[in-house]
Regions:
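Extended, low-complexity cationic-aromatic segments
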Residues: 15-101, 213-216
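RNase H-like two-metal-ion nuclease catalytic core shared by retroviral integrases
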Residues: 70, 118-119, 146-168, 180
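Active-site proximal helix-loop segment of RNase H-like, two-metal nucleases, encompassing DDE(D)
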Residues: 83, 159-178, 192-194
Length: 225
């Protein structure tokens, strides 16, 4: 469900900017990368389950033990079908900085990397300079052209679709008790998705947005075409 708190000038400008980015033809030297994150609860079985056998489904006890939480950074280049999902101990500025460092390293020939982010407080240059050093952090941030979604507009971030794919195809209803297990599962999912070049087909355009939300394009609205 879309949550649009207020369709003001700032919301429309950022909406149009992100949608204009998605409408651009694929440019290998200017990849469009989307990033989002979500917490993951770690659970362990109290008693071992029963595996499936002919004529019988697998069974699992309802009781489980809480083993803390972890985090998943979903990073995807939708048009190229490149996936960089990573499991981390937490959703901290330091972890974000290291993920960005790895994303930039994956595109050594890019003129710029268009990065779509929501407005979480760690999604900023300061996270990089604080945890990677002033010089290295600034150099990495300069490799990026950041496109922030509007407030209450995170549905515009295709990384949310990536998180949904991970939840259904990777995590499922299984219980993962440790970060090491979560990491091995997400790495395996990355490998499969990258081998298949799994792409996200985004169909919501600026034209559709203007009809859906009933606004006219403002000549001063920022867009990159």
């Amino acid at each position: 469900m879309w949550c649009v708190a207020e369709l003001d000038a700032d919301y429309i400008a950022k909406l149009e900017d992100v949608l204009a980015l998605y409408e651009r033809p694929y440019r290998p030297t200017e990849p469009v990368v989307c990033l989002d994150e979500k917490p993951v609860s770690l659970h362990a079985d109290v008693r071992p389950g029963r595996p499936a056998r002919p004529g019988h489904l697998a069974k699992r006890d309802n009781e489980y033990r809480r083993c803390g939480t972890a985090n998943i950074f979903a990073v995807v280049e939708p048009q190229a079908g490149r996936h960089f999902t990573r499991a981390t101990p937490d959703r901290s500025a330091g972890q974000f900085a290291r993920v960005i460092r790895d994303v930039v390293a994956a595109y050594p020939a890019a003129r710029t990397i268009h990065l779509v982010l929501d407005n979480l407080n760690i999604h900023c240059e300061k996270s990089l300079t604080d945890h990677l050093g002033e010089r290295a952090g600034r150099a990495l941030w300069r490799r990026l052209t950041v496109h922030y979604t509007p407030k209450h507009g995170s549905w515009l971030n295709q990384a949310e679709i990536e998180l949904s794919l991970i939840a259904r195809q990777c995590l499922g209803t299984r219980r993962l008790a440790a970060l090491t297990h979560l990491r091995s599962e997400t790495r395996a999912w990355n490998t499969r998705a990258n081998r298949r070049h799994t792409r996200i087909r985004w169909t919501f355009t600026r034209k559709k947005a203007r009809v859906k939300f009933g606004y006219q394009r403002n000549p001063s609205t920022r867009s990159r075409t």
